């Protein structure tokens, strides 16, 4: 079968549905679900590759009712609607075919099967060959010498033997057999209790459904005869429904279905719009076209990669960069070591290898003889008239240590991309390159990427402005990067001797706990092994609630199980919970923090991650100083280890109930707004309403529960989750939530509107216009999780940007006043400063004023400020 005389007919929606269920959920750069579109595109490309057709068409159902519904109104009535995230994609599937230049066939009132039948039979009548691409059994009726069925699921042509094996009859009799069997998926009734074996036997004997009913007295089985007699109408209707109409009134011109390569620009735009970059290579190789995509830059062709080996060569580059006014720069790092500076200008890339590969933040000597390039590059970085384009700015800032604040006119592509699409899969430009094992390859391949920095910048800056997120990037994300770099370099002092003492105390109690645990269990074992612990608790000791984990083939010994055992009076559970708490504190903090004290600064230096969350919220690592415990006495003891340098005080500035204030503002909740304007205690007010008590009747427990309800609602907590948190029944928790929504009218409406917006758009926005994408909103299994995230994201995201604005304004004010106060940590709602003792009274009102006036809201923003010698004192 050659392509010259073959027509390829593709069952469009059959392919789309198959693609949807075969493909993991994917989202476009705009947050829209595109998994089915991606799979459909990939499948069509495979068909082009495998069949290389001259004539081809994608055939679609027109939707709505057709002539079969006139015959049988309940036709397909039992079919559930497609999944919500597939429905969104269906109007776009024709774009896929169109952009690949596939002709499209459809006609109102007819199904794709009928259109396929019409074109297949007419084409075959001309002596040409037809290949139908479908897994639909109904189309097997069309099989002839010239009409073949190719099943893409099985990757093979269907033969007559396959049909006989499955249905007990040949393709020309399939309609007769199927009329008796019926088709549950299409709600075609058939004849009750007649399956494939009986149906094929009857058709073999009588030849057709009509002949059966004309010769009912010859049916040997009395029961079958009665069943058929009672189902005559159903069988004849089924025969009509299953048959294919091969005479649909269509303009049959085979030449109109001739395939030609698609328009390169049009196809490129389509692939870019939906983020199908992984298909670029296939498209280029298959269609012999070039896709010019600014984001797929690792494979770009570089005119020249040149290594600069001396100051004269670099000076020539600097002259050219000054003349042009823009260049790309990237500090390439690998496994903590600085490998090279890579510069780009016009169509060239320049490499400066770094001989000193120390990854110590403070030991890199920019004045070393080996660093002949340092001053020249620094002069370029500090020249306001030259724009610099980089990716991941902080390593560059660290390289120049205390001089980094002079770097100006620089743009960070990583931060620009984050401002565009926080929450979507961030494509690190250098991720694949850094998987290389040969250093020389890493440098060369990175140089190929850097050559495209300027083009990528121009495209991304346009996208930022088009999406109205440029100000977020330029006013918040970029300046905060400089401040985070400064904070990381400053670090915070930790009392190593105190931690050593605390670690010893924890260790003593841990040993004592282990002895008690072993005594109660009657044996020694590895307490840290969930498998061994499960066997001891639920096999040796025969305690209740033992539940085997299917994945691990061992008992579950999580906190929930131990707490349940504790509630039922099993002392060993209390000991185990305490043991886990102390060992975690010891391993995570008291033992490890002293090891992370820098040898030169004698301080701990965390790393702040700016692009790791969907809401813009900062995170911290190596060590994580945002999760230092606060609610337990032991956690507070660890906070005591964070101390002010001699002659300084620590100052904590903490936003009070900021997320509830933001909720009152964005959801316009009058009761909440009035409470904050009146400076009422919001948790007390909630407690009064929930528990139907007067203020003087409330206990601290009432307020604690009200606080949990207030903040739980923000995070979309369920009745089950609240019940567990408050240790009440599900019914009580449901009643609390119901009363909360009644008291604070508008909260529930805000939540429903936010979920609906997220479902329609794939993202939500905070008060500053930052888009927080929720790509899992259409995932059936994770929908509820995504909805909770969508509810909270505008609140948390607004909170995050408020505190970032405060940090930027405070940094400017401190610089302006030439104060020695320094910002050392950001812990979500809290800023931690280190101030000289004689500046505490000066800086405190400045901090309060700036933090409380970072933005305008319908309610006042309140900041609580405390100063002390250590972090525990000020909480």
From Swiss-Prot:
The protein's role, per its UniProt record: In addition to polymerase activity, this DNA polymerase exhibits 5'-3' exonuclease activity.
Pfam families: 5_3_exonuc, 5_3_exonuc_N, DNA_pol_A
Top-level EC class as recorded in UniProt: transferase
Protein name: DNA polymerase I
Self-association state and partner proteins as the record states: Single-chain monomer with multiple functions.
Protein's organism: Rickettsia conorii (strain ATCC VR-613 / Malish 7)
NCBIfam families: pola, PRK05755.1
EC number, UniProt record: 2.7.7.7
Keywords: DNA damage, DNA repair, DNA replication, DNA-binding, DNA-directed DNA polymerase, Exonuclease, Hydrolase, Nuclease, Nucleotidyltransferase, Transferase
Annotated family: Belongs to the DNA polymerase type-A family.
Encoding gene (name): polA
Residues covered by the 5'-3' exonuclease domain: 1-283
Catalytic activity: DNA(n) + a 2'-deoxyribonucleoside 5'-triphosphate = DNA(n+1) + diphosphate
GO molecular function, one term: DNA-directed DNA polymerase activity
UniProt-listed GO biological process terms: DNA-templated DNA replication; double-strand break repair
Domain of life, source organism: Bacteria
PROSITE patterns: DNA_POLYMERASE_A (PS00447)
């Amino acid at each position: 079968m050659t392509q010259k005389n073959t027509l390829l007919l593709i069952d469009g929606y059959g392919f789309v549905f198959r693609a949807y269920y075969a493909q993991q959920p994917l989202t476009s750069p705009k947050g829209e679900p595109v998994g089915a579109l991606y799979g459909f595109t990939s499948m069509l490309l495979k068909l082009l590759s495998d069949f290389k057709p001259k004539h081809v068409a994608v055939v679609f159902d027109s939707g709505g009712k057709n002539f079969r519904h006139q015959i049988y109104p309940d036709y397909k009535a039992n079919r559930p609607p497609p999944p919500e995230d597939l429905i969104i994609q269906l109007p776009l599937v024709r774009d896929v075919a169109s952009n690949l230049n596939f002709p499209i066939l459809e006609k109102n009132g007819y199904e794709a099967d009928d259109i396929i039948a019409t074109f297949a039979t007419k084409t075959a009548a001309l002596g040409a060959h037809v290949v139908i691409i479908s897994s639909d059994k109904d189309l097997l009726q069309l099989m002839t010498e010239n009409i073949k069925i190719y099943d893409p699921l099985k990757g093979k042509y269907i033969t007559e033997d396959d049909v006989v094996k499955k249905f007990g009859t040949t393709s020309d009799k399939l309609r007769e057999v199927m009329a008796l069997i019926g088709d549950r998926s299409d709600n075609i009734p058939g004849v009750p209790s007649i399956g494939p074996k009986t149906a094929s036997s009857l058709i073999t004997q009588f030849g057709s459904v009509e002949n059966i009913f004309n010769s009912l007295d010859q049916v040997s089985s009395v029961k079958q005869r009665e069943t058929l007699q009672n189902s005559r109408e159903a069988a004849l209707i089924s025969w009509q429904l299953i048959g294919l109409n091969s005479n649909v009134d269509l303009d049959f011109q085979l030449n109109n279905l001739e395939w030609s390569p698609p328009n390169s620009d049009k196809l490129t735009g389509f692939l870019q719009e939906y983020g199908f970059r992984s298909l670029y290579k296939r498209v280029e190789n298959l269609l012999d076209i070039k896709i010019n995509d600014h984001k797929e830059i690792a494979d770009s062709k570089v005119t020249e990669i040149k290594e600069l080996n001396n100051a004269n060569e670099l000076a020539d580059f600097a002259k050219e960069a000054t003349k042009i006014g823009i260049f790309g720069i990237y500090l390439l790092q690998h496994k903590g070591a600085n490998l090279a500076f890579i510069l780009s200008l016009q169509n060239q890339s320049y490499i400066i290898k770094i001989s000193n590969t120390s990854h110590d933040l403070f030991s890199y000597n920019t004045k070393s003889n080996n660093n002949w390039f340092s001053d020249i590059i620094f002069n370029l970085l500090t020249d306001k008239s030259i724009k610099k384009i980089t990716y991941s700015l902080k390593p560059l800032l660290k390289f120049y240590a205390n001089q980094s604040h002079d770097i100006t006119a620089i743009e960070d592509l990583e931060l620009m991309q984050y401002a565009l699409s926080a929450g979507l899969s961030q494509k690190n430009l250098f991720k694949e390159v850094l998987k290389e094992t040969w250093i020389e390859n890493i440098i060369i391949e990175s140089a190929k990427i850097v050559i495209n920095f300027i083009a990528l910048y121009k495209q991304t800056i346009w996208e930022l402005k088009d999406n109205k997120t440029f100000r977020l990037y330029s006013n918040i994300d970029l300046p905060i990067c400089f401040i985070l770099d400064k904070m990381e370099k400053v670090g915070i002092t930790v009392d190593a001797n105190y931690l050593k003492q605390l670690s010893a105390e924890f260790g003593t109690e841990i040993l004592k706990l282990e002895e008690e645990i072993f005594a109660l269990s009657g044996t020694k074992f590895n307490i840290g092994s969930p498998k061994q612990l499960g066997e001891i608790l639920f096999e040796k000791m025969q305690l209740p609630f033992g539940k085997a984990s299917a994945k691990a083939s061992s008992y579950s010994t999580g906190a929930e199980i131990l707490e349940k055992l504790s509630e039922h009076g099993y002392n060993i559970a209390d000991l185990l919970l305490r043991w886990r708490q102390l060992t975690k504190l010891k391993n995570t903090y008291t033992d490890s923090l002293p090891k992370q004290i820098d040898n030169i600064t004698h301080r701990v230096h965390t790393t702040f991650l700016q692009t790791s969350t969907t809401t813009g919220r900062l995170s911290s690592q190596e060590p994580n100083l945002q999760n230092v415990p606060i609610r337990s006495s032991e956690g507070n003891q660890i906070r005591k280890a964070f101390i002010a340098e001699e002659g300084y005080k620590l100052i904590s500035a903490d936003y009070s109930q900021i997320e509830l204030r933001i909720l009152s503002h964005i959801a316009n909740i009058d009761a909440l707004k009035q409470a904050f304007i009146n400076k009422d205690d919001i948790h007390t007010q909630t407690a009064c309403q929930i528990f139907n008590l007067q203020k003087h009747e409330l206990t601290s427990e009432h307020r604690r529960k009200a606080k949990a309800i207030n903040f739980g609602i923000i995070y979309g907590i369920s009745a089950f989750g609240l019940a567990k948190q408050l240790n009440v029944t599900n019914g009580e928790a449901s009643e609390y939530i119901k009363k909360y929504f009644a008291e604070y009218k508008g909260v529930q409406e805000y939540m429903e509107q936010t979920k609906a917006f997220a479902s329609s758009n794939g993202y939500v926005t905070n008060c500053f216009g930052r888009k927080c994408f929720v790509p899992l909103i259409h995932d059936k299994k994770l929908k509820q999780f995504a909805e909770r995230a969508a509810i909270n994201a505008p609140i948390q995201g607004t909170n995050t940007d408020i505190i970032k604005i405060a940090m930027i304004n405070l940094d400017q004010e401190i610089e302006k006043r030439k104060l020695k106060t320094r910002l050392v940590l950001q812990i979500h709602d809290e800023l931690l400063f280190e101030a000289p003792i004689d500046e505490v009274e000066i800086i405190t009102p400045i901090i309060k004023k700036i933090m409380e006036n970072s933005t305008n809201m319908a309610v006042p923003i309140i900041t609580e400020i405390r100063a002390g010698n250590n972090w525990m004192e000020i909480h």
